[in-house]
C-alpha cells in the first residue's frame, strides 16, 4: 500500500491562510495582540527567506519583478537613512512592500513542487471557517444581526468563502457530485447572509469570469445533467430550509432593499459614501505626489479624515491612515508606481497564459476568477495578508516548470562484449582500419 505524502506541500499555503482572523480568533481575541503581530513579522521574514531559496525556479519575468521589489525596498531604506538617520524609521510603511514577499515565496515553492492536493486544503478551510463562525462569531448567524446590519464575520474571512465557492463549483462541473454543488450554494448563501456588499459584487464578477474561463477548461462537462441540479437544488433547499418564510419577513426585505440601494448609490449612502469622504480628505496629497507617493513622509502626515458628526479625527495620529481602499493606500504611499509595481506583472502573465492555446484546468480557472474579483475588492478594502500568496499560487499553477524530456533509450550492452571492447587498444583499432 502506497501512501502519498504530497499533503505536506500544503503547509506553506495553509500557514498563510491561518493568518486570517477567522483562524487567529481561536487563539487571539484581540487582532492588535503584540504576540500576533510578532508572529506575522516572523512569517514575513520566513517568506523572504523562502523566496530567496526557490529563486532559481522563477521564470524570467518573475525573477525580474523580484529584483525590482528588492530594489524598491533598498531605495526606501536609503531614503530612511538619509532623511531620518536610521534604516527603517517607520516599519508601517516598509511592511506595505514586505507584505508582497509571500507572493514570491509561494510562487517559487509551488512552481518547484507543483499542484498540491487542493481538495484537502479546501476541506480544511471549509471546516475551519464554519467552526469559527459557530464558535467565535455566533452572533453573525442570528437573524437579528442581519436585520441590524451587524457584521460579526469580517470582510476578509467572508471574501475567503468566495474562493471556496469557486473551487467547489468548478469541481462539480468537472467531476459532478451533489455534495460539491451543495457546498457551492451554501457558500453563496453565507456570502449573502453576512452582508458584505463588496463581496456580493465580487461574487458576481468572479462567477462571470469563471464561467467564461470554463469555456476553455479541460475536463469540464457542460451537459444538461450537470446544469439541471443547479436549478433544482436551490428550490429544494429554499423550500425545505424555510428560506421562503424568512424572506417574507418585512424586516429582512427592508434590510435587503437598503443594501441594494447602498450598492446603487455608493456616493450618497452606506459605507461607499464614507470611503468617498476619506478619499477626498487625502486627494490633494495624492495629486501632489502622483508618481511615487509620499512614502515615509506620508506616515508623518496627521490624520486628515474627520467624523462628520463629532468633527474629531477618526483615528489617532501615528497609527497609519487606515485606508479602506487598496488603490488609495498605494497611491498615497507609493503613487502610480506603487499600483503598477504590484499589478502589472500578474496581469501580463495572466494575459500571456490566456493567449496560449493550451486549455486551463478547473483549479486554475477558479483561482484566476478569484484574482479578477480582487481588482474590484481593492476599491473598498486593503488586501488581506493571504491575498498576495493567492496571487503567487495562481501564477505558479498556471505556469509550471517545463517537464524535462525523457532520456534517449540506450540498448544495454552485454558485459562480455564491453570487456572485449575495453581490452582492444585504440592503436590496434587504428591499424586495423588502415
Predicted regions and their residues:
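Long extracytoplasmic/lumenal interhelical loops at the membrane interface
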Residues: 265-288, 292-334
Amino acid at each position: 500500500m502506497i501512501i502519498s505524502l504530497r499533503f505536506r506541500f500544503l503547509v506553506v499555503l495553509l500557514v498563510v491562510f491561518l493568518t486570517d482572523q477567522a483562524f487567529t480568533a481561536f487563539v487571539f481575541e484581540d487582532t492588535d495582540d503584540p504576540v500576533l503581530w510578532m508572529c506575522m513579522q516572523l512569517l514575513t521574514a520566513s517568506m523572504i527567506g523562502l523566496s530567496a531559496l526557490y529563486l532559481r525556479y522563477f521564470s524570467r519575468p518573475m525573477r525580474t519583478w523580484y529584483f525590482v521589489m528588492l530594489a524598491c525596498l533598498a531605495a526606501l531604506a536609503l531614503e530612511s537613512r538619509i532623511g531620518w538617520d536610521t534604516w527603517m524609521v517607520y516599519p508601517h510603511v516598509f511592511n506595505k512592500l514586505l507584505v508582497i514577499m509571500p507572493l514570491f515565496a509561494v510562487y517559487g515553492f509551488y512552481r518547484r513542487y507543483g499542484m498540491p492536493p487542493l481538495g484537502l486544503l479546501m476541506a480544511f478551510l471549509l471546516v475551519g471557517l464554519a467552526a469559527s463562525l459557530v464558535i467565535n462569531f455566533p452572533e453573525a448567524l442570528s437573524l437579528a444581526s442581519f436585520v441590524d446590519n451587524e457584521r460579526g464575520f469580517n470582510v476578509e474571512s467572508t471574501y475567503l468563502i468566495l474562493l471556496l465557492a469557486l473551487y467547489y463549483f468548478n469541481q462539480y462541473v468537472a467531476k459532478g457530485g451533489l455534495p460539491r454543488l451543495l457546498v457551492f450554494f451554501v457558500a453563496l448563501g453565507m456570502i449573502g447572509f453576512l452582508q458584505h456588499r463588496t463581496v456580493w459584487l465580487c461574487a458576481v464578477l468572479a462567477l462571470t469570469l469563471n464561467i467564461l474561463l470554463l469555456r476553455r477548461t479541460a475536463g469540464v462537462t457542460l451537459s444538461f445533467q450537470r446544469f439541471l441540479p443547479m436549478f433544482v437544488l436551490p428550490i429544494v433547499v429554499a423550500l425545505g430550509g424555510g428560506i421562503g418564510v424568512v424572506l417574507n419577513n418585512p424586516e429582512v426585505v427592508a434590510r435587503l432593499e437598503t443594501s441594494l440601494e447602498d450598492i446603487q448609490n455608493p456616493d450618497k449612502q452606506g459605507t461607499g459614501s464614507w470611503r468617498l469622504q476619506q478619499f477626498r480628505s487625502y486627494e490633494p496629497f495624492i495629486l501632489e505626489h502622483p508618481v511615487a507617493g509620499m512614502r515615509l513622509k506620508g506616515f508623518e502626515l496627521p490624520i486628515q479624515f474627520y467624523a462628520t458628526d463629532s468633527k474629531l479625527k477618526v483615528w489617532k495620529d501615528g497609527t497609519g491612515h487606515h485606508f479602506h481602499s487598496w488603490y488609495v493606500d498605494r497611491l498615497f504611499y507609493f503613487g502610480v508606481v506603487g499600483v503598477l509595481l504590484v499589478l502589472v506583472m500578474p496581469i501580463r502573465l495572466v494575459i500571456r497564459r490566456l493567449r496560449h492555446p493550451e486549455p486551463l484546468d478547473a483549479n486554475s480557472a477558479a483561482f484566476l476568477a478569484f484574482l479578477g474579483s480582487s481588482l474590484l475588492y481593492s476599491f473598498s478594502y486593503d488586501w488581506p495578508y493571504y491575498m498576495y500568496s493567492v496571487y503567487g499560487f495562481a501564477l505558479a499553477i498556471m505556469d509550471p516548470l517545463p517537464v524535462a524530456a525523457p532520456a534517449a533509450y540506450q540498448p544495454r550492452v552485454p558485459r562480455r562484449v564491453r570487456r572485449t571492447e575495453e581490452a582492444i587498444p585504440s592503436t590496434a583499432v587504428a591499424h586495423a582500419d588502415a
